[in-house]
A protein has these predicted regions:
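Membrane-interface aromatic/basic loop that binds lipid-linked glycans or pyrophosphate carriers
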Residues: 136-184
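Residue-level recognition of alpha-helix termini/interfacial anchor residues
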Residues: 40, 111, 115-116
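Catalytic core of nucleotide-sugar-dependent glycosyltransferases
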Residues: 71-80, 85-112, 126-156
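Short, charged, amphipathic alpha-helical segments
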Residues: 114-121, 144
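Donor-binding/catalytic cores of nucleotide-activated saccharide
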Residues: 1-69, 74-89
Length: 184
């Protein structure tokens, strides 16, 4: 189901699904007005990977006017052996630091209460995506951090099943919890 409204411009309030899933959190396929970036002091995080997501999602929630372009303006190379996306084991926790910074930005702008459910659902989604795409032994290290503290810190653990948008993702989260209980 398409999340964007059939008219432009629009803003975050007119996106019909999780605002953090309506667009991918990379910046290279988006255009921004310089004045908007400067006015909102938008910056990339200084970390190896996931360094553009805070910029992108901050822009998304702060923008009063968003437009899309249907023309293909860029092509992306995939499966490049030494790319950052293929070597995330070296910076496996960067997504977590982005999620914490995003939550703080939302709070600083008085938006967290309005967007909290989308944020927590995205935090689960992005945590699981990172977990599912890492290799061992980093994958186990991430699972231990998620279950040991990060799911609590991100507000995921305190939520009932019906709070989550995606049943499959919630099921994977519960399976992860049950796996840990069974091992003890």
């Amino acid at each position: 189901e398409w999340a964007l409204p059939p008219y432009e411009p629009f803003n975050r309030r007119q996106i019909s699904t999780n605002i953090f899933r309506a667009f991918v959190g990379w910046a290279w396929d988006k255009l921004y007005l310089r004045e908007f970036v400067m006015k909102n002091d938008l910056k990339f995080q200084e970390q190896r990977t996931t360094n553009d997501a805070l910029f992108v999602f901050s822009a998304l929630v702060l923008a009063e006017r968003i437009c899309t372009v249907s023309e293909i303006l860029i092509h992306r190379r995939v499966d490049t052996r030494d790319s950052l996306s293929k070597t995330r084991e070296k910076s496996w926790d960067n997504f977590y630091h982005m999620l914490l910074a995003l939550r703080q930005m939302l709070k600083d702008h008085g938006l967290y209460t309005e967007i909290e459910k989308d944020y927590i659902n995205y935090a689960l989604h992005f945590s699981l995506w990172n977990y599912n795409t890492l290799a061992e032994p980093t994958k186990t290290k991430l699972r231990e951090k998620l279950l040991g503290e990060w799911y609590d810190e991100l507000g995921i653990s305190a939520r009932p099943e019906e709070y989550f948008y995606d049943e499959y993702e919630y099921g994977q989260y519960k399976d992860m919890l049950n796996f840990t209980v069974e091992k003890q």
